[in-house]
Every structure is written in C-alpha cells, then in structure tokens.
Amino acid sequence: MWQPATERLQHFQTMLKSKLNVLTLKKEPIPAVLFHEPEAIELCTTTPLMKARTHSGCKVTYLGKVSTTGMQFLSGCTEKPVIELWKKHTLAREDVFPANALLEIRPFQVWLHHLDHKGEATVHMDTFQVARIAYCTADHNVSPNIFAWVYREINDDLSYQMDCHAVQCESKLEAKKLAHAMMEAFKKTFHSMKSDGRIHRSSSSEEASQELESDDG
C-alpha cells in the first residue's frame, strides 16, 4: 500500500530505533574498534610510515674497489689491492677519514649504505650477493682497521670480473666483527644452497665451501 514520504520516513526511523534498542540489550561486548574515533584510526595507520628508516650496521669509510686477477684466493690475496686503494685515499685526503658509509651484513646479502654530509643514510646503496663473495679478511699490514672482500661482478655481457672492495673501520675490533659476521652469512648461504639442491655432489660442496672462505686473521 502506498504511503506518503513522511509516513515512510517515520516508519523507517521507528524500525531503526527498535534495532538499536535490541543491540544495546545484548550482553556480548561490542568490538572495541567501533568505539575508535576516525582520527585515532588514521593516526595508527599512518604514523609508522612517517618514521625515518633506520639501518643496523657498522659505520665505515669506503675506500673503493679495484679489479684483481686469479681464481685461487688465499691468505694475503687482498694485501696488494688494499695497498693500492689505501694509497689513492691517502693522496686525496688526510690521515683521518670521516665515515661515509654504513656496512650491513645480512644472511644472504651485504648492503653498503652511502651516507650524506650529515652522516645519515641516503637512497644510494650498493648490494652484494653473499654467494658471489669469494673471499674476505680483516688482516692487513697497511692497517688493522681495514676489512676487505673479493666480489664476482657480472657485467652486462654476462662476463665477470673479480673486484676487491675495502672499507676502513673505526677500530681493529670492528673489522674483526665484520669478518666474523661475513663468515656467518657464508654458512647460511651455503646451507641454503645445499637445501635448495643447487649443490649436489660432495665434491661440489667442498668447492663451494672453499669459495666462500673467510680469513679473520
């Protein structure tokens, strides 16, 4: 039966009021989210996005990289490249180098965050795959504070070259800590490769373990 608009509106308001009364009589607690104000919900979702990104790692001075030859990386193999990088850096600056990077060793990757003049991490970051690091050490005659690693860099034409990267740490202890952290990353990467089936024979396992070698002195 047709009803005027005012009567339909009154009927709707009466039904809504009765439903609200039923809800208030229920003993089950209403979910707490219903009592949150819109402003509070908005703050909860946006506040974490506004926080500055923090990085855990060791502040270092990145000395650069230099190509190296050979496939067998034994103790002392980074001495010559490190001396070359050290000389280039000492010619350009004083004996005291300000930290310009943050080295972060993760289970399967090494992140080198570049710092700005305020000492804060920038968006520029170099990434190294642990599986392509052939050797690392914190034992150098030119300075006990230097940590270096040999990395297999793959070019655009799929050829590769071995580069020696070096950083100067704040102390000898920090350099040793980086070497030990890298060794732990080696172990996790090796076990992951083995469990994924990328290492099949025992001989291949021995070769992989020799390639992922660390010498912390």
Curated annotation (Swiss-Prot):
Residue numbers of Phosphoserine PTMs:
202-203, 214
Q: What is its main location?
A: cytoplasm
What the entry lists under InterPro entries is as follows: PH-like_dom_sf (IPR011993), PID1 (IPR039112), PID1_PTB (IPR039114), PTB/PI_dom (IPR006020)
Please state every residue range assigned to the domain named PID: 60-217
List the subcellular locations. Answer: Cytoplasm
* GO biological process annotation, one example: negative regulation of D-glucose import
SMART domains for this protein:
PTB
Sorted alphabetically, which CDD domains does this protein's record hold? Answer: PTB_P-CLI1
Q: Which GO terms describe its cellular component?
A: cytoplasm
Record's compositionally biased regions (Acidic residues): 208-217
Keywords of the record, alphabetical order, are: Cytoplasm, Phosphoprotein
Role of this protein = Increases proliferation of preadipocytes without affecting adipocytic differentiation.
Assembly? Found in a complex with PID1/PCLI1, LRP1 and CUBNI. Interacts with LRP1 and CUBN.
Under PANTHER family, the record lists:
PTB-CONTAINING, CUBILIN AND LRP1-INTERACTING PROTEIN (PTHR16265:SF1)
Entry protein name: PTB-containing, cubilin and LRP1-interacting protein
Q: Which organism is it from?
A: Mus musculus
